[in-house]
Amino acid sequence: IYFIQRAFKATIDHELSVEEADAMLGRPIGLPKTAVFGLMDLVGIDLIPHVTESLVSNLPINDPFHEIAGAGKESVNSMIKDGYTGRKGKGGFYRLNKDDGKKVKEARNLVTGTYQTANRRAGFPSAKMGKRGLSAIMDCNDKGAEFVTDVLLDSLSYAAYMVPEVSDDIYAIDGAMKVGYNWKNGPFEMMDAIGAKSMVKRLQDSNRLVPPFLALAAEKGSFYNIQSGEITRLSPNGEMIIVERSGEYLTVADLKRRGKPLNRNGSASIWDMGEQVLLVEYHTKMNAMDPMNMEMLLNAVDMAESGNWKGVVIGNDATNFCAGANLGLALFAANLAAWKDLDDFIALGQDTYQTLKFSEVPIVAASAGLCLGGGAEVLMHCDAVQAHSESYVGLVEVGVGIIPAWGGCKEYLGRVQEFSLASNGPMGAVMKAFEVIGTAQVAKSAEQARSMGFLSPNDGITMNRDRLLSDAKKLLIEISVGYTPPEPRTYSLP
């Protein structure tokens, strides 16, 4: 609430449009694209006055929230009066209007109260610096950077001001903001990214007060640290306390803190997950499939088959499991008429996926986010999948004028037959597979992926992203007992 109110006030003070404010306070700083005004539309603008009044009446008189409470009050009250309460009403700071029968997104002018076509390129040049970190944005010399700096300095220092009143566990506070509001990093993680000492200097240079807890972090060096491979957090008494996490939590970041990969190249790494289980982690852009991560898959299977390993999990911490093949690589080869290289790429993929399918050890995929094209084919060639609930699975190749080349077509046809997803008759399964693949249908969730046949009825679904790899490892250990590779399927086509 403080962040929203502070951002509203800064938008008015810096004379920005709602699109400019959201463009700067969304993805460039690690927040969802709804940012501030889009978020108010989502939750309901009519709730804002009630929440603000409740905080004003209950917070101590010296709380910094009082300095910004009620920012944009006239605009908000006018909108509520006219029925502009957000997405549940006629619209809010944004609305959809029709122009010649086409839907047009419009944004509200905070000064005049009128609507105009929303500017989809409203960000300032400093927004592009977000990839380099928060400090890079704040160090820029444009109006957008000044706006972001004002909002972040006050909002982040307010989070430090509220320790220990809200909680003395900053890890819990950061977790609440990440899970509850889908922030990429919590406020204390963001201050560590900027640097605790840098935060103090920026506050002092702008004549702002430095909260005692932030000053303590600057003295200690940071809010978080690593001790013997475990995360530690700063407590209000100055001690660095090991963050206690459920034993069900496991991420690649945990493995990286505790050791080094068993093997790696520019596209993928092989990790020891513990309990004799290997993990293959992709780290290409969008985790796209290329020859080098296929090489790591083959290496992992070879290691598992020849060593004392129970099997291989394929997964990562990234937003997306695998967005498909590296089509840029394929297009580059095609433009050079390097047809043999293109053939080799396709053949390597087919060999790799068949190796996953018929390995002497079980292979489990831990899917999350986009699992498209070659990524969906990986899932279908594994013995089992442990899917995060927000897994988007589909064979989308026809969308760019190609067909699945690594076994997805025959695997999906087999699943349609096995799971009885089509009507009876000699052409039922073929027609169903042709329809799904030919129209590039994508499952919008793990449950839908199961109902469409991309996942099997026995595949698992995990709700908590931090538990996904742990659940996948458990599933692999279960199926490793007495494991035998599947028999090749015979396809009888009409």
Regions found by a protein language model. Name each.
Residues 1-312, 316-319, 328-348, 352-361, ...:
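N-terminal glycine-rich phosphate-binding loop for ADP-containing cofactors
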Residues 377:
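Short alpha-helical segment that forms part of, or immediately flanks, the ligand-binding pocket
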